[in-house]
Each structure stands twice: as C-alpha cells, then as structure tokens.
Amino acid sequence: MSLAKTSIIWFRRDLRINDHPALLAAIESAEQVLPLFILDKKQIDEAGEKLLAYMGQSLRALDESLGNRLHIIEGDQVEVLKELIAAHGVEEVHISAEYERFGAERDARVEAAGIKLVRTGSPYAVTPGRVLKPSDATPYKVYTPFYRGWRTHGYRAPAVTPKKFNVVQPTDKFRAFPDFPMPAGVNVIEAGEAAALKRFKEFTKNGLDSYDENRNFASIDGTSKMSTYLKFGEIHPRTLLENLGESKAHDTFRKEIAWREFYADVLFNNPMTDIDYYAPKFKEMRYDKPGKQFKAWCEGKTGYPFVDAAMRQLLLEGWMHNRTRMVVASFLVKDLHLEWQIGERFFADHLVDYDVASNAHGWQWTAGCGTDASPYYRIFNPIEQGKRFDENGDYIRRYVPELAHLSASEIHEPWLFLDGYSKGYPERVVDHATERLESLARLQEIKADKPLGPHA
C-alpha cells in the first residue's frame, strides 16, 4: 500500500523527538511529516507566567530538533487543523492520547468536526485505565496494590525514532512563536529534550544509587528534577524506567514514577477530582476564608522557616522539593484551615512542573481527603520537619536570608533567641500547637475515622 503524502504530528504534552510513538506512527504513515503546535488562548489565559515562559523555551528547543520546521500558531484547533489538512492533503493527524478533562474534551471536539485523530502512546508508561484488580477488573484505590499491578502489567520498550525523516517547511504564518517572558528574578531549569536527557544522565551517574537515602533532604540535590520534563513530555517515563535496575534505590525511584501514573489513573476514573473532594465528607468540614495569613503563606512570610524557605523557592524557581510540598500543604490546610483547592490553585499559578493529576491528588493526600490519603490525624509539624530534613539549616539560609546569621540550633525556632528577628524575619502567623488541636477538633466533627472514596 502506498504511503500518504503528508501526515500531521500534533504536539501537545510531548515536546520531544525520541521515544515518541505518535511521531513514529506519523513518520511511517506518510512521505513527509508536518509537525504542529497550536497555542490555545484559554489555556494561555489560565496558565502561570513561569510555566508559559518555560513552555516557550521548550518549543524553541523542539523546533531546533526539527530543523526549524515546527509549525506553530495561536488559534482554534479545528480551524487550524482543517486549514493544514486542506493545504497539504493530509489524511491523518497523529497524537499522543490525553486523559485529563481539558485534553480529552478538546480531542473529542476535534473529532466531532470530522477530523481523524490517530492515537499512539500517551504521557505514561502504562495508559490510565489499564491497571485493574484481577479479582473484579475495577480500578485500584490504594497505591501499593496499584504499584504491584502496574509492574505486573509492564510497559513497552522505548520507541526508536529514525535519525532522518522528511519534514514540511512551514510558511511565515505558521512560525508564530510566542513571547512569554520569564518573570524578573526567576531562575528555572533549562528547557528542552536535550536538557532533560543530560540531567537524567547526570542523575543516573551521581544521584540515582543514593536516591532512597537523599530524596527527602531539602538542602541536598538528591532528586532527579525530572518532573518538569515529564510534564512537558520532553522525556518519556519509559526512557527513565529503561535505565533502572532492581536495587532499593532504583526501586524507590521507580515507585515515584508509579505515583505519577497512579494519580493519573485515579483522575481518569474520577475525572472531577482535580477540583472536587475524592472523599465527599470533607466538604462538610468547617474551613476558614483566606486572608492575611494566606497572603503570608503565599509570600513565604509565615514565621515558620522551613515553610517560608519552600514557598520562596517556589516563587524563585517555579519548583519545590517534594518533601516541602507536603509540609506547606499541611500548613495551609491544617494550620490555616483553608480548603486544599486554594493551595492547589496557587501551585498551579507558580509551578513549572504543574501536573493536574499529581498536584490535585498530592494536595488531597496531605489534606486527608484523597485516595490512599495521609491519615486525617497526621499533621506535619513545620518545626520538626525542618529539623529532620534540613538539620543544619542550609536550605533555609539559601531562601530566607533574614535567618542566615543563625546557627543550626537556632534557625528552626528563631523566636526563642534574642537575635532571631534582628534581620526583619516576621513573627509566626499562628501557633502550630494550637492550630493542630483545632484541626483535630474540626475533623472530629465530621467523624473522619477513615475517609472513603466516591466509589467505595
């Protein structure tokens, strides 16, 4: 059977060339490939500045990989696709499947307009919805058995993209690269597939074998920093998994990849839980309205050094250590008594690695209302967390210069020392011990002995 003349590869959350099944399918189906990225105005209006600026850099890197032939334009997806299909006689539009509400609804609208979409692969090693309980073919609600099922299911080997393939030369109209400036003073990681592969190579050489020991310590560069690259699809999780062995450290890293896949699976099976409670009873709890204390949390001025260092890291880098994400989330929900969605939206505005499923369900885990949730009575102590995971205070000093003059024994509780507030560090907005008891009292009111999922 003869090949079609041109196929479109429509890039979305997969800004890479290697290990890209949809791109490979497009190459194999036609004589030449038209690479396309469509800027969506609604998505742009809702996205954070840092994320957009990073995306702009990533698109430039992808364009370079394609020999400066990426077609890029802002517009309605149906209109743009129909124009290119007509101009180039395209029969098929190839995509990586998407499972979050926005992407799924967009693709359904495109297909309803009569455009044929060919789905190959997804942003995950195992597509959401495929890992099911062998007993009754229902989705898992708890991570540990999901992980066992996920490993048993397995995943394909990375797809091999040809080194050379024919790419359509775009007209000037389709070279509308966006100008998304990075906010002043913000320093994010380098964007693009090459940067992702380089970072992962460095991690496998210098960090992977000690990952289980170092991953929780905020002052150590002990994590892979792959979350942003996975969010934009600059690297595929299979590429990471392909390099893992069976040691404890490697398995710990594998389990972190599986957490991302678990949350994607949970959201796929419960599509409104990106904005709504997985455990509905938590809607009944008494919550406060955001005010001055929330503003202090947003600015990293709560008076709790470990919390403030984390929030300032987020503002400066568009990224935050996973340990501190849990600590600041617990502080917002259980010390300030605000609903998790408020913090989730703030993260969405500032995280470069913002992932709908991981973010929403990470917040719900900490709040105690999610699947496989942290027990409702677990309330992170922001002082003890700092002492445990930033013992010498190096992380705090890096982001909270008002406390840099304090010793390791002083820096976690500056209010106990005469010199603690001498450089302008703010006083505590709340007393943790008091708010912990208040949080437990509110939880007791809804009798949250064991949060139940919506399908329990």
Tell where the protein language model's regions lie, with residue ranges.
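Trp/Phe/Arg-rich N-terminal binding region typifying the photolyase-homology
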Residues: M1-P158, A249, S358, A433, ...
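Soluble or luminal CAZymes and related metallo-dependent hydrolases
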Residues: N18, Y54, S58, G192, ...
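Residue-level preference for long, well-ordered alpha-helices that form the structural scaffold
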Residues: L51, M55, E299, G303, ...
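Glycine/tryptophan-enriched, flexible segments
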Residues: D136-F282, F389-D390, D394-A456
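Active-site-proximal binding-pocket segments
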Residues: D221-E402, A408
